[in-house]
C-alpha cells in the first residue's frame, strides 16, 4: 500500500473540511436598471449562524462592576422569535453563588462581587438560549472569564529554621543546604518568582557562605572553615517575590549550620622527655603518666590518642594504657628488669589518633618522639629456682626413701647454687615426698600404694620452698611426678601406717622450715616461682605457716571418696520404722470420747467464730421465733430476797453481743447477750437464785447443754397458731416472725412465701389483701423497672447511758449522743426493781442494713419487791406496747421522761414499738421533736391502749420540711373514746392512727417523749411512693384493724 499517497490524501481532506467550514459564499446578482440601462453588481454574503462571544478579564481583589457588562451573548434566532438567555456554572448556581448575573432579554452578563484568583483562577459560564417553551434554540455556549493575578501573597518558607552541617576545611562552592519557599500567586508569573538573599551572618568576621538567588542553594565561599575557631554559624535569609523587586513582598528564615570536626590537628605529648627509676625485679602499675594534647573535638575518635613505642622496649618490659576520658597514657612495668642484664633503658614514644588524619594535613604529619630514660636500680636478690618446675617419674617398684631427684635454688647475684637457703616442702599431696633441708634432694616418704595412686589419679604436683633466713626471702618451685607402672601395693594397714608416718614427718618438716627459728626477724622477702618474680612480706614465720596450711588443705581437698557407712543404713531403717509406727499411733489416739469421760475435744469458746454450729439440734439453723405469747406461771411475791428466773419459752434469739451491768435501786441488773442465734428448749422452768435485787439471765453457754423437748415445742407452736388465728383475718400477712425487706437483699430464706395458717390450701383469695411489701415483687413480675435502694452504712459507736440518780429532763435534750452502727450493744430484757423511780436509759439500736428478728420481753408494774423475768402477753386492755423501750414506773403516775439528744448521724430513723405502761397515768400524747435531717423516718407500731384516759386523735405536725419523710403507724388498737384522726399535712404520705402527736421532721435525729418510756432509734426503710391513708374505725381492745403492712426497714431517698 502506498502510505505516502494515503497521508497526502488525508491531509488534503482535512484541509478541505476546514476551508469549507470557515469559508464564505459570495453571490453576485446583476441588478438591471431599466431607466438608464445599466447593470449593478450587488455582493450578498452568507455566513454561518452562531453566538456572539465576548468576555472581559476580571482583576482579583478589585471592584470590577465598572467593566460591566463583562460579556454579552446574542443568538440570531432572536430575529423572528422571542429568546430568553440563561447562564449557569461556578459563581452563578454553584459556590461561590451570585458572582455573575445575566439580563435574560439582552444577554448582558454582569459581575457583582470581588473575586480571588487563589480560590478561583477562572470561571466557566454555560450560556443557553431558550424559546418561549423553554427549549434550546442553540447549542450551549461555554464562556471563560479569566481572573487577573495581583501580588497579594508573600513568600512562605517550608521551615522557619533550616539546619545543616558541613565538615571543616571543605572546598569552596561545596553545597551546604537548599532553602525552599513558595508563593500563592499565579505560577510562572513575576508575582510568584522569589529571589533569595543572605542578610545576616553570625559570627560576622568574614562571609563564609553564599546563596543562589533563584534556587536558594547555600554553598561555601572558601575553604577556611575551622571548627576549632567557630563550631557553628547562623544565617538570616530573606526571600522576596517579583524577583526581589522593590514592590515585592518578602519573608525571612533562619539557617543554623554546624561545622563538623575532622582530624586536622596533630596530637603531641607533654612534657617532651621523662626520667624515671625502678628497682630490678619490681613491677609497677603506674611508672609515669604522659599527657596528650589534641585540639580536635573532645571524646571523639579525632581527639583520642594512641601512644606507641618507637624503640627501647625490645624485651617487652613496658606497656602503655590509655585513659580515654583524660587522654593520659600510663607507662607500666609488666616484666621484671634485671640489673645484671641492663642498667639503663632509653624509651622513644610516638603518638597518633584513633581516626585517620584528614587529607588536608596528611602530608604534614610526622612522628615526633618523646624520650623516656629508665634507670634500673640494683637490689640484693634472693634465690630462685631455675627452671621454675621439674618433672620426675616414679614407678611402683620404688620403695621408701627412694631418691627421686634434686631441686636446688640459684643465687641471682652469683648465678651459682645458693648455699644460704634451706628447703622445705610446700604443697605435698598425700605426703608423698620428702626434701632434704640443706641439699634439696627429693625422696619418697613411703612406697606408693594403690590408694595414693588412685587419689592422685596418676599425677602428682607439689611445691618446694627455698627460704633464705638472712635475707628473709622465699622462693617457690613446682615438682611434677608422673606415677607409672602397675602392681601398686594394696595393704591397707601398711598404707595407713605409712600415711600417719608421712603426715607427722611432713608436719615436723614444715615446722622446721617455717617456724623452727629461734630469732625470727622482719625484713624483705622475695618469692620466685619458676622465674624471677618477687614479692615483699614482713614475717617469714607467717609465710611458712601459710605453706603448711596449704599442704594440709591440698591433702584434704584430694580426699573426695564417698562411702555409704553403717550410720546411713541405720537412718534409712529408722525412717521405715517410724512410718510403720504411724498406724499404731493413730489406733491409740483418742479422737473424741464420751461426754464427761475426761478425754475428748475441748469445746470451742463461745467468742470464737468457727465452723461449729451454735445451735444444739441437728440439721440447719432454726429460724428465729417469737416467745411473747407463751403463758407465764404465777410469780411468787412472798420472797423478796430470791429472784426466780423462769424461762418457759426455751426459744430465744440473740443477734447482738455484749454484757451490761447497771445499778437498780439498791441492787444490780445484769444482762447477758451473745453474738449468735440459738434455740433452747426445756420441759421444765429454769430457776436461778441470786442475791436480793439481782437479776441473772442464762447465757448461750448454759443453754447449749440442754436437749430438744418435742412436747414443749408442739405446745408452743400450737399456742402461737391459736393466738394468730384469733387476730383479724384481714391482715396483709399473718406471719409476724418474717420481717420483710426488699426482696433479694438480705431477706431470710422463704420470706416471699407465706407460712400463715390458711384455712383452704387452694384458696388464693389472700392475694387480694397483700400489702405494699409485695409491691417490688409485683413490679418485677409485670416487667417494670425497679430502682435500687441506696446503701446506708451506719457508723459503729458505743451507747452512752445517763448516770443513776440524775433528775429526768422534761422538754430538753440530755447530753446523750449515741451513734448508730452495726455493732452497737442492745440491752434486750430489762427489769426494774426497787422502790424508787428509775430514770430513763437510752438504748441505741445496732440494727444494720437488712432484715433482723428481735424478740423482747418487758414488763412494768407498781412497787415490786422482786424483779421477775416475764414474757409479755399479746394483748392487754390497759397497756401501750412499745418495742425496745425501757421506762421508769411508779405506783401512781409516770414522771420519768426520756430525752434523746440530737444524733450526729443525719440518716438515722426513729422507731417506736410496743410500749408497756399502765394506763392510769399515760400522758395524752407522745411528742417527737424535729430531727435535724429531712431523711429521718419515724415509725410507730402496735399501739394498744384502753378506751379511756387517752386523747382520741393522732396529730401529725403539718410542717414537714421534706415531702419524702415517711411516718408509718401500724396496728393501732383504740377504744370507743377516740374522737378523731387527723392525717399528715404537707407530705406525700398518709397516716392513720390515734393518740400520738409528732412534730415536724426537720433536722435532727433526736426524740423527746412525754411518756415514761425510752424510744430506740432503729433502721427503718420505706419508699416515698407508698401512700398510707387508711382510717381506722372503732375496734375492741383485743382486735387490730389495719391495712398497713409492717416494714422492719424504711429507706428515705432524696
From Swiss-Prot:
InterPro entries: Cadherin-domain_protein (IPR050971), Cadherin-like_dom (IPR002126), Cadherin-like_sf (IPR015919), Cadherin_CS (IPR020894), Cadherin_Y-type_LIR (IPR000233), Catenin-bd_sf (IPR027397), Desmosomal_cadherin (IPR009122). Gene3D superfamilies: Cadherins (2.60.40.60), TCF3-CBD (Catenin binding domain) (4.10.900.10). GO terms for molecular function: calcium ion binding; gamma-catenin binding. Component of intercellular desmosome junctions. Involved in the interaction of plaque proteins and intermediate filaments mediating cell-cell adhesion. Residues 24-49 form a propeptide. GO terms for biological process: cell-cell adhesion; homophilic cell adhesion via plasma membrane adhesion molecules. Disulfide bonds: none annotated. Desmoglein repeat repeats lie at residues 830-856, 857-886, 887-916, 917-944, 945-973. This is Desmoglein-1. It comes from the Eukaryota. The keyword Cell division does not apply. Residues 508-517 have a biased composition (Gly residues). Binds to JUP/plakoglobin. Interacts with PKP2. Interacts with DSC3; there is evidence to suggest that the interaction promotes cell-cell adhesion of keratinocytes. PANTHER family: DESMOGLEIN FAMILY MEMBER (PTHR24025), DESMOGLEIN-1 (PTHR24025:SF9). The lineage of its organism: Eukaryota, Metazoa, Chordata, Craniata, Vertebrata. Residues 542-554, 1029-1040 have a biased composition (Polar residues). SUPFAM superfamilies: Cadherin-like. Residues 50-157, 158-269, 270-389, 386-493 form the Cadherin domain. The keyword Hydrolase does not apply. SMART domains: CA. It is a single-pass type I membrane protein.
Amino acid at each position: 500500500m502506498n502510505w505516502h499517497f494515503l497521508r497526502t490524501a488525508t491531509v488534503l481532506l482535512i484541509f478541505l473540511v476546514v476551508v469549507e467550514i470557515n469559508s464564505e459564499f459570495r453571490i453576485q446578482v446583476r441588478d438591471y436598471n431599466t431607466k438608464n440601462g445599466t447593470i449593478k453588481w450587488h455582493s450578498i454574503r452568507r455566513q454561518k449562524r452562531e453566538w456572539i462571544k465576548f468576555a472581559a478579564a476580571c482583576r482579583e481583589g478589585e471592584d470590577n462592576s465598572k467593566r460591566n457588562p463583562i460579556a454579552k451573548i446574542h443568538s440570531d434566532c432572536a430575529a423572528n422569535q422571542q429568546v430568553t438567555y440563561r447562564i449557569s456554572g461556578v459563581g452563578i448556581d454553584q459556590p461561590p453563588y451570585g458572582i455573575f448575573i445575566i439580563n435574560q432579554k439582552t444577554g448582558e452578563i454582569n459581575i457583582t462581587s470581588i473575586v480571588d484568583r487563589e480560590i478561583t483562577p477562572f470561571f466557566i459560564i454555560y450560556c443557553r438560549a431558550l424559546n418561549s417553551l423553554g427549549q434550546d434554540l442553540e447549542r450551549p455556549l461555554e464562556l471563560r472569564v479569566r481572573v487577573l493575578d495581583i501580588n497579594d501573597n508573600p513568600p512562605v518558607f517550608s521551615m522557619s529554621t533550616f539546619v545543616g552541617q558541613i565538615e571543616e576545611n571543605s572546598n569552596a562552592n561545596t553545597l551546604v543546604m537548599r532553602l525552599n519557599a513558595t508563593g500563592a500567586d499565579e505560577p510562572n508569573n513575576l508575582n510568584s518568582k522569589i529571589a533569595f538573599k543572605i542578610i545576616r551572618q553570625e559570627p560576622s568576621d568574614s562571609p563564609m557562605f553564599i546563596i543562589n538567588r533563584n534556587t536558594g542553594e547555600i554553598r561555601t565561599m572558601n575553604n577556611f572553615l575551622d571548627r576549632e575557631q567557630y563550631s557553628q554559624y547562623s544565617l538570616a535569609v530573606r526571600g522576596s517575590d517579583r524577583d526581589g523587586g522593590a514592590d515585592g513582598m518578602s519573608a525571612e528564615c533562619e539557617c543554623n549550620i554546624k561545622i563538623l570536626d575532622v582530624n586536622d590537628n596533630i596530637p603531641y605529648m607533654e612534657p617532651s622527655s621523662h626520667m624515671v627509676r625502678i628497682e630490678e625485679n619490681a613491677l609497677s602499675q603506674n611508672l609515669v603518666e604522659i599527657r596528650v594534647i589534641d585540639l580536635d573535638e573532645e571524646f571523639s575518635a579525632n581527639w583520642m590518642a594512641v601512644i606507641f613505642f618507637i624503640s627501647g622496649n625490645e624485651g617487652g618490659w613496658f606497656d602503655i594504657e590509655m585513659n580515654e576520658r583524660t587522654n593520659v597514657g600510663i607507662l607500666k612495668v609488666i616484666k621484671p628488669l634485671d640489673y645484671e642484664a641492663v642498667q639503663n633503658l632509653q624509651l622513644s614514644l610516638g603518638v597518633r589518633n584513633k581516626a585517620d588524619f584528614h587529607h588536608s594535613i596528611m602530608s604534614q604529619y610526622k612522628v615526633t618522639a618523646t624520650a623516656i630514660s629508665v634507670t634500673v636500680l640494683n637490689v640484693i636478690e634472693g634465690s630462685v629456682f631455675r627452671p621454675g618446675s621439674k618433672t620426675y617419674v616414679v614407678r611402683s617398684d620404688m620403695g621408701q626413701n627412694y631418691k627421686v631427684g634434686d631441686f636446688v635454688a640459684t643465687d641471682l647475684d652469683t648465678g651459682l647454687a645458693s648455699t644460704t637457703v634451706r628447703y622445705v616442702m610446700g604443697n605435698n599431696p598425700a605426703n608423698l615426698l620428702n626434701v632434704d633441708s640443706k641439699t634439696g634432694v627429693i625422696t619418697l616418704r613411703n612406697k606408693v600404694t594403690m590408694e595414693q595412686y588412685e587419689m592422685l589419679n596418676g599425677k602428682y604436683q607439689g611445691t618446694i620452698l627455698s627460704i633464705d633466713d638472712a635475707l628473709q626471702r622465699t622462693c617457690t618451685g613446682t615438682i611434677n611426678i608422673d606415677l607409672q607402672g602397675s602392681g601398686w601395693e594394696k595393704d591397707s594397714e601398711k598404707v595407713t601406717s605409712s600415711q600417719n608416718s608421712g603426715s607427722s614427718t611432713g608436719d615436723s618438716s614444715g615446722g622446721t622450715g617455717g617456724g623452727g627459728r629461734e630469732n625470727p626477724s622482719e625484713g624483705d622477702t622475695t618469692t620466685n616461682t619458676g622465674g624471677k618474680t618477687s614479692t615483699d612480706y614482713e614475717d617469714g614465720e607467717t609465710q611458712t605457716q601459710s605453706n603448711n596450711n596449704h599442704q594440709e588443705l591440698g591433702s584434704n581437698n584430694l580426699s573426695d571418696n564417698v562411702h555409704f557407712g553403717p550410720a546411713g543404713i541405720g537412718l534409712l531403717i529408722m525412717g521405715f520404722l517410724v512410718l510403720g509406727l504411724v498406724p499404731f499411733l493413730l489406733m491409740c489416739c483418742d479422737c473424741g470420747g464420751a461426754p464427761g469421760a475426761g478425754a475428748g475435744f475441748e469445746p470451742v469458746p463461745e467468742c470464737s467464730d468457727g465452723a461449729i454450729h451454735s445451735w444444739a439440734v441437728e440439721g440447719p439453723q432454726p429460724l428465729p421465733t417469737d416467745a411473747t405469747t407463751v403463758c407465764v406461771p404465777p410469780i411468787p411475791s412472798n420472797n423478796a430476797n430470791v429472784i426466780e428466773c423462769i424461762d418457759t419459752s426455751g426459744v430465744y434469739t440473740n443477734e447482738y453481743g455484749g454484757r451490761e451491768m447497771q445499778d437498780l435501786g439498791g441492787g444490780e441488773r445484769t444482762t447477758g447477750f451473745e453474738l449468735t442465734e440459738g434455740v433452747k428448749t426445756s420441759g421444765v422452768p429454769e430457776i436461778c437464785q441470786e442475791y436480793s435485787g439481782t437479776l441473772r439471765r442464762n447465757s448461750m453457754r448454759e443453754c447449749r447443754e440442754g436437749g430438744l423437748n418435742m412436747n414443749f415445742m408442739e405446745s408452743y407452736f400450737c399456742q402461737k397458731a391459736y393466738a394468730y388465728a384469733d387476730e383479724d383475718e384481714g391482715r396483709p400477712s399473718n406471719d409476724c416472725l418474717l420481717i420483710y425487706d426488699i426482696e433479694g437483699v438480705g431477706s431470710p430464706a422463704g420470706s416471699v412465701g407465706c407460712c400463715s395458717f390458711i384455712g383452704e390450701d387452694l384458696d388464693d383469695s389472700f392475694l387480694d389483701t397483700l400489702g405494699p411489701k409485695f409491691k417490688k415483687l409485683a413490679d418485677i413480675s409485670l416487667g417494670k423497672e425497679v430502682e435500687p435502694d441506696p446503701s446506708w452504712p451506719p457508723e459503729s459507736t458505743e451507747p452512752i447511758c445517763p448516770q443513776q440518780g440524775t433528775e429526768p429532763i422534761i422538754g430538753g435534750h440530755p447530753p446523750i449522743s449515741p451513734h448508730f452502727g452495726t455493732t452497737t450493744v442492745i440491752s434486750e430484757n430489762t427489769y426494774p426493781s426497787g422502790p424508787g423511780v428509775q430514770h430513763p436509759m437510752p438504748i441505741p439500736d445496732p440494727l444494720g442494713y437488712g432484715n433482723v428478728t428481735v424478740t423482747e420481753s418487758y414488763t412494768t408494774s407498781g412497787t415490786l419487791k422482786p424483779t421477775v423475768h416475764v414474757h409479755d402477753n399479746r394483748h392487754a386492755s390497759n397497756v401501750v406496747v412499745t418495742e425496745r423501750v425501757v421506762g421508769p414506773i411508779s405506783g401512781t403516775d409516770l414522771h420519768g421522761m426520756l430525752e434523746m439528744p440530737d444524733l450526729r448521724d443525719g440518716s438515722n430513723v426513729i422507731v417506736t414499738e410496743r410500749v408497756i405502761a399502765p394506763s392510769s397515768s399515760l400522758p395524752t400524747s407522745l411528742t417527737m421533736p424535729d430531727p435535724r435531717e429531712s431523711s429521718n423516718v419515724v415509725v410507730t407500731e402496735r399501739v394498744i391502749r384502753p378506751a379511756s384516759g387517752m386523747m382520741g386523735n393522732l396529730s401529725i405536725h403539718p410542717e414537714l420540711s421534706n415531702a419524702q419523710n415517711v411516718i408509718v403507724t401500724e396496728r393501732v388498737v383504740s377504744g370507743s373514746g377516740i374522737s378523731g384522726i387527723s392525717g399528715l399535712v404537707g407530705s406525700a404520705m398518709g397516716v392513720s392512727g390515734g393518740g400520738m402527736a409528732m412534730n415536724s421532721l426537720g433536722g435532727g435525729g433526736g426524740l423527746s417523749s412525754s411518756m415514761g418510756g425510752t424510744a430506740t432509734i432503729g433502721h427503718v426503710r420505706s419508699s416515698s411512693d407508698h401512700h398510707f391513708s387508711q382510717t381506722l374505725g372503732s375496734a375492741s381492745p383485743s382486735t387490730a384493724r389495719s391495712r398497713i403492712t409492717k416494714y422492719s426497714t424504711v429507706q428515705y431517698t432524696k
